[in-house]
Amino acid sequence: MGFNIERVDKPFVVKSPYQPSGDQPKAIEELATRIENGENDVVLMGATGTGKTATTAWLIERLQRPTLIIEPNKTLAAQLCAEFRELMPDNAVSYFVSYYDYYQPEAYIPQTDTYIEKDSNINDDVERLRHQATANLLTRRDCVVVATVSCIYGLGTPEEYAGRMLFLKEGQQINRDDLLRRFVAMQYKRNDIAFTRGTFRVRGDTVEIIPVYEELAIRIEFFGDEIDRISTLHPLTGDVIAHEPQVHIFPASHYVAGPERMERALKTIREELDGRLSELRKQGKELEAQRLDMRTTYDLEMLTQVGVCSGVENYSRHLDGRAAGTPPHTLLDFFPDDFLLVIDESHVTVPQIGAMYEGDASRKRTLVEHGFRLPSAMDNRPLKWPEFLQRVGQTVYLSATPGDYELGLSDGVVEQIIRPTGLLDPKIDVRPVKGQIDDLLAEIKARVARNERALVTTLTKKMAEDLTDYLLERGIKVEYLHSDVDTLRRVELLRMLREGKIDVIVGINLLREGLDLPEVSLVAILDADKEGFLRSYRSLIQTIGRAARNVSGVVIMYADETTEAMRQAIDETDRRRAKQIAYNQEHGIDPKPLIKKISDVNDMLAKEDVDTQTLLEGGYRNAGKAGNTHLGVPVLDPNEADKRHEEILKAGLPAQDLADLIRQLSEQMHTAAEQLQFELAARLRDEIRDLKKELRQMTEAGQ
């Protein structure tokens, strides 16, 4: 890489109350040995519930290499990222997915002469996490990034991004106004009133900025032209969190370009425009030429005056200084050369990565042909599969059902079949289609009586909805789940199933990879003998796996004949089950039910309240308001917080005042959670923890 930032080299450490067990020690050892011996592609075939996530974390700890983990969708990426943050709390675990909550790409339909403007809704929190991932990668080696295929899309050059980075330290000579100009050049905006992420404000000799990848603000205090002090502070309360002798501040956009680079880009865009206009006019496409001239001239003016324009990514080839046809810079370019790639659910993710380029290219080709974009817009694209392979090194493929591609690359798979809990793969029962609904109803009632749950998978949406209506009429608490159900509702339904508010979910293709439901003891597969994508060997194995987290897990396939896919799935499940039974008998293990916490923000609040109460009962009970009076507590204005902080410093009993502040912030945390401001509640929780740590130190010191 062409930039020079010294990365902090901190060891990867897994912090877990558990040790590797079952097949995990053998799998970790074999994976690590193969990678250390230089094998480029290694496959871990891990049965559902065997702890593939923990195995991956221990593998990273063993290899001590920065790691990229690619997931097939945002939901699984978020789930895995949360698990890794628990397993590696002291390392930089980042989340990198598309920041669009809604995205309608720019498109043109020639048949109806319809132009569709790009329309999108950006999620600010996800954008912050993307910037946090790139900032971590450039400053630390102990990085794990959990991403989706978003990581193969263009992102601007790491050299330019790092080159525009600002390094500040106490005692440094820099003029305040020069610093403000640097912030503007890095695409930060000045806003002295609404102080939010990506903005800075000035108060006399004090400059405050919230980097686009941070939740805390940075305060830079000047004495003349010298930086006197640097601190991080809570942007809401104004409380100083920590003193920072030095800081790195990265640009507010990944598509940032210096003056020289921008000047060169403007020149090459004009040259390409002139050439393309001439070409279109020779072909008699006057309308297309006029359209392209008007749109590109406007974009050039915006780039000249502001440094950015709508759809700036379409000019990324010029801004990066790349040759025509060359691949874009992506997140992969931000990693050190020795990074490890882990592809989770590889049977889904590998084809997904390979398919991204063509879909993007066909849409852009139409835009270019009809004068909506310059031909260089074609180079703002995802990586092609061969380009992706050139940029990655050693790869671990994880799946319960590895695809033919990865099986063909690897010299035998590493198996992880034995579960640490001793749980077995479910029994499989094949029953005739005739009378299947009444038989299913009887099985569901038996599960409901035992306080267990059931999943039913159908082939069509209509069938899912009709079956749901039928079960509802017979008093079963049931909901359906298919592609028309939005993501938030999907998460809510799965939570309701785990809590027992509903007993059955009927779905189509959504009950497969990564669904972690220990309460489910029955999985019913209707029309199991209808061959196709939803009833292939891999789909059946994944669906069967949903019942593998319960001691009494059973799978019922309703079919009049046994297809080849069914036979393979049954044989593989029986093979795994026999191996698991033999291991349990040899080691005297009784299968234990998997107890998985139903995570909730209320759990976090309750846990924090217990800890706070225990601490404050040590002599600070009169501080603040008595009892739980968090309803309606206003959030502190930053100015009031500054005043409050000064009062605490002047007070004769600092510990007492600190306890008072902890109570106030606890009340604010509850208020934020009730208003569904979970990000704010989490920030307040973190600050409360810091203050409690300080109070404990004071108590221990006898203050």
From Swiss-Prot:
Gene3D superfamilies, per the entry: P-loop containing nucleotide triphosphate hydrolases (3.40.50.300), UVR domain (4.10.860.10)
Domain UVR residues, every copy: 659-694
Beta-hairpin, short sequence motif: residues: 99-122
Record localization: Cytoplasm
Keywords: ATP-binding, Cytoplasm, DNA damage, DNA excision, DNA repair, Excision nuclease, Helicase, Hydrolase, Nucleotide-binding, SOS response
SMART domains named in the record: DEXDc, HELICc
A Gene Ontology BP annotation from the UniProt entry: SOS response
Signal peptide limits: none
Entries under InterPro entries matching the protein: Helicase/UvrB_N, Helicase_ATP-bd, Helicase_C-like, P-loop_NTPase, UVR_dom, UVR_dom_sf, UvrB, UvrB_inter
Helicase C-terminal domain residues: 436-589
Entry GO CC: cytoplasm; excinuclease repair complex
Highest rank taxon of the organism: Bacteria
Domain Helicase ATP-binding: 33-190
Residues annotated for ATP binding in this entry: G46, A47, T48, G49, T50, G51, K52, T53
Gene Ontology molecular function: ATP binding; ATP hydrolysis activity; DNA binding; excinuclease ABC activity; helicase activity
Domain comment (free text): The beta-hairpin motif is involved in DNA binding.
Family: Belongs to the UvrB family.
Function: The UvrABC repair system catalyzes the recognition and processing of DNA lesions. A damage recognition complex composed of 2 UvrA and 2 UvrB subunits scans DNA for abnormalities. Upon binding of the UvrA(2)B(2) complex to a putative damaged site, the DNA wraps around one UvrB monomer. DNA wrap is dependent on ATP binding by UvrB and probably causes local melting of the DNA helix, facilitating insertion of UvrB beta-hairpin between the DNA strands. Then UvrB probes one DNA strand for the presence of a lesion.
Summary of subunit composition and partner proteins: Forms a heterotetramer with UvrA during the search for lesions. Interacts with UvrC in an incision complex.
NCBIfam families: PRK05298.1, uvrb
Name the UniProt record assigns to this protein: UvrABC system protein B
Organism this protein belongs to: Bifidobacterium longum subsp. infantis (strain ATCC 15697 / DSM 20088 / JCM 1222 / NCTC 11817 / S12)
